[in-house]
Amino acid sequence: VSTSAPEWTGRTDGPGPEHRRWHSAINESPGATGVSLIGFPSDIGVRRNGGRPGAQAGPGAIRAALGSFAIQPESVVHDAGDVAVSGDALEAAQDGLAEAVAAQLGAGNLPFVLGGGHETAYGSYLGLARSGLLDGRRLGVLNLDAHFDLRQADRATSGTPFRQIAAGEAERGADFTYAVIGISQPSNTAALFTTAAELGVRHLLDLDCQERHVEDVVEFVRAFTADVDVLYLSIDLDVLPAAQAPGVSAPSTLGVPAGVVIEVCRLVGNDPKLVLADITELNPTYDIDNRTARVAARLVHTIAMSAADRSVLEGR
């Protein structure tokens, strides 16, 4: 990672582990394994995809919102800093992210990448592929997103990462095992639905992911994770309703309620198969009262604390 971890700030209630918050816990136990944050401040893919820029400020906004969250006395959390992102050099930035992810996996940590646009996902995947953790194992990619992000384009964008991952899986002779929760029908063309079907992608529409469907959503996740050996979770904040997440590159017209998304995060965070997560598309320029940053922080916190309740190394 090219830049060291920024200074964290937040509320302080007193000394001692019973008063721990993220800002005081970060990098407190450098030798211990735990959850390790990596910032990827890029909106290059969003701009290439015709979206509204601003997601490069996402990592800082998530850290700021996370700083005062209370944390369990025994939880181990690290901040590995930000990957360098320069100009329009997306591919070089993704390569840098891959190196950072592979390094954290090699150290026995659970990397959690803070985006950045959803072009983050391909860099995350490359790091997992380089780590050796996929050797002889079946990878499952679970995406919480209003979009399939399976576009075919001349160059990488925020709309192409899972098409690129499909190619990467084919290259290593593996099946592309990909599921999306929260697909918005009006936001995906018939061609994208056809591509998803051809690639064997499982999905749930946003219409079928409302509060009353939470048990069905949980069952969908359980069925998906049962079929894989290693799990990678990617969250695009545009999966949430625009009222709960206005500060994203492409706000949702319906969305999956935060309560349902949190249930998925708890379930996946508790799964020993989870080895990598990222959260993307926070665009602070369009946020209202830090609403989106705070819900993003809550999702990161939920997964990190769920993972802390088990051994991060279990199941590797």
Q: What are these language model-derived features?
A:
Residues 2-316:
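Conserved alpha-helical scaffold segments that buttress catalytic/binding sites
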